[in-house]
Amino acid sequence: MSFEVLEQLEARVQSAVDGITLLKMELDELRAQNQQLKEENQHLRNEHQAWQERLRSLLGKMDQMNSEG
């Protein structure tokens, strides 16, 4: 192989390595973002459940008042 071919091969390999490195960085960022969204989703689900329980309690009290009155 000539020196020129080896240089071209080295450039292609370096380009591939750079691309893989960038993709790994992007993957790490997306994983972190995904984890953050999972935590936010769980928080919102808990909040939603709390509101549902409050609403059920209020509706139960209203039903109780209607049946007594």
UniProtKB/Swiss-Prot annotation:
Gene3D superfamilies: 1.20.5.340
Taxonomic source organism: Tolumonas auensis (strain DSM 9187 / NBRC 110442 / TA 4)
Localization: Cytoplasm
Coiled coil regions, renumbered to chain: 6-68
Annotated protein name in UniProt: Cell division protein ZapB
Subunit structure: Homodimer. The ends of the coiled-coil dimer bind to each other, forming polymers. Interacts with FtsZ.
Function: Non-essential, abundant cell division factor that is required for proper Z-ring formation. It is recruited early to the divisome by direct interaction with FtsZ, stimulating Z-ring assembly and thereby promoting cell division earlier in the cell cycle. Its recruitment to the Z-ring requires functional FtsA or ZipA.
Lineage: Bacteria, Pseudomonadati, Pseudomonadota, Gammaproteobacteria, Aeromonadales
Primary localization: cytoplasm
One GO cellular component term noted in the UniProt record for this chain: cytoplasm
